[in-house]
């Protein structure tokens, strides 16, 4: 096996890591849809899905079979190519962000020195899926949802990036592994508490989750940008939303809660437990908060979150300069 050089071995290991992380993230995103329905039932003092399988354990399989056999319909008035490519972008964009998230000290697909910038790039790419879906459907409700999504994403991605800069300044690196290692003695949640708050809010908005689900507000836009989608195309949008939740939860853990670090248990177990906690917080937020008006969402971002992020960044810079003297 002379062809099995160290370079080839490294490539094969990287591909193996990518496949494993892909399968785990997609599986977690799919199971979260069932877990959300059960937890919402618990929070609202009612039964969740409990008919298919033992205590509803096979509900996810039933939903997948139902969605697989639904008619994959494309409207005659739609732009077929863009209409088809939009759910693929929605599914794959935030999934790419897990390539840079270190699950443990040795398990990361791409240990990029510009990892933070890569995440901001794929987060910005996700909005194109919504824009393509809304525009190509040639439906007024879809188009309104796409316009809302573009305005909301542009607004909230401003302080999504600014909220990370305090962490980057403290760690001295854009590399996520270096950021985790810099939290060996103290997690960033303590010195960067306001950065965590604004990043979490922006993360919910980027995922278009309640209460920032303005692009698909059912009561106003009849499900918004994916109103014309059915079958597996709708399934890609549906699972892609939950993959975004997993990705944002993993990044919150990596940036502010020490990543894989923790006592006694293996590192990947700690990462999974922390990420699962924040995935549950997404569900709790949906069960607890009402949906505000669209103008209130935009005003909250520009008038409250952005100034708070800038103040946090200025204070962080002042503390770093003071300690350097």
Swiss-Prot record:
InterPro entries: NADH_UbQ_OxRdtase_su1/FPO, NADH_UbQ_OxRdtase_su1_CS. NDH-1 shuttles electrons from NADH, via FMN and iron-sulfur (Fe-S) centers, to quinones in the respiratory chain. The immediate electron acceptor for the enzyme in this species is believed to be ubiquinone. Couples the redox reaction to proton translocation (for every two electrons transferred, four hydrogen ions are translocated across the cytoplasmic membrane), and thus conserves the redox energy in a proton gradient. This subunit may bind ubiquinone. PANTHER family: NADH DEHYDROGENASE SUBUNIT 1, NADH-UBIQUINONE OXIDOREDUCTASE CHAIN 1. The gene is nuoH. It catalyses: a quinone + NADH + 5 H(+)(in) = a quinol + NAD(+) + 4 H(+)(out). NDH-1 is composed of 13 different subunits. Subunits NuoA, H, J, K, L, M, N constitute the membrane sector of the complex. PROSITE patterns: COMPLEX1_ND1_1, COMPLEX1_ND1_2. Signal peptide: none annotated. GO terms for biological process: aerobic respiration. Coiled coil: none annotated. It is found in: Cell inner membrane. This is NADH-quinone oxidoreductase subunit H. The lineage of its organism: Bacteria, Pseudomonadati, Pseudomonadota, Gammaproteobacteria, Enterobacterales. It is a multi-pass membrane protein. It holds the Pfam family NADHdh. It comes from the Bacteria. One of its GO terms (cellular component) is plasma membrane. It comes from Proteus mirabilis (strain HI4320). Keywords: Cell inner membrane, Cell membrane, Membrane, NAD, Quinone, Translocase, Transmembrane, Transmembrane helix, Ubiquinone. Belongs to the complex I subunit 1 family. Its EC number is 7.1.1.-.
């Amino acid at each position: 096996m002379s062809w099995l050089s160290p370079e080839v071995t490294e490539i094969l290991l990287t591909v193996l890591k990518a496949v494993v992380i892909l399968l785990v993230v997609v599986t977690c995103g799919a199971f979260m849809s069932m877990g959300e329905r059960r937890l919402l039932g618990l929070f609202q003092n009612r039964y969740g899905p409990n008919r298919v399988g033992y205590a509803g354990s096979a509900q996810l399989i039933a939903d997948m079979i139902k969605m697989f056999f639904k008619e994959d319909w494309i409207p005659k008035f739609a732009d077929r190519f863009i209409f088809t490519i939009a759910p693929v972008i929605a599914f794959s964009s935030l999934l790419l962000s897990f390539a840079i998230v270190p699950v443990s000290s040795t398990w990361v697909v791409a240990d990029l020195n510009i990892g933070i910038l890569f995440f901001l790039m794929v987060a910005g790419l996700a909005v194109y899926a919504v824009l393509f879906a809304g525009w190509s459907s040639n439906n007024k409700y879809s188009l309104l949802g796409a316009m809302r999504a573009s305005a909301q994403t542009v607004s909230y991605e401003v302080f999504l990036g600014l909220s990370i800069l305090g962490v980057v300044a403290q760690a001295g690196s854009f590399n996520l592994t270096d950021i985790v290692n810099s939290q060996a003695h103290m997690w960033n949640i303590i010195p960067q508490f306001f950065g965590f708050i604004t990043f979490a809010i922006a993360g919910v908005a980027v995922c278009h989750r309640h209460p920032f689900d303005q692009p698909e507000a059912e009561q106003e836009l009849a499900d918004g940008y994916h109103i014309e989608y059915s079958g597996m195309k709708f399934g890609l949008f549906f699972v892609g939303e939950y993959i975004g939740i997993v990705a944002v939860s993993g990044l919150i853990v990596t940036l502010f809660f020490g990543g894989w670090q923790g006592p006694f248990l293996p590192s990947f177990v700690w990462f999974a437990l922390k990420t699962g906690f924040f995935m549950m917080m997404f569900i709790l937020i949906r069960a607890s908060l009402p949906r505000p008006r669209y103008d209130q969402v935009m005003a909250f971002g520009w008038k409250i979150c952005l100034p708070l992020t800038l103040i946090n960044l200025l204070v962080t810079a002042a503390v770093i300069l003071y300690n350097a003297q």
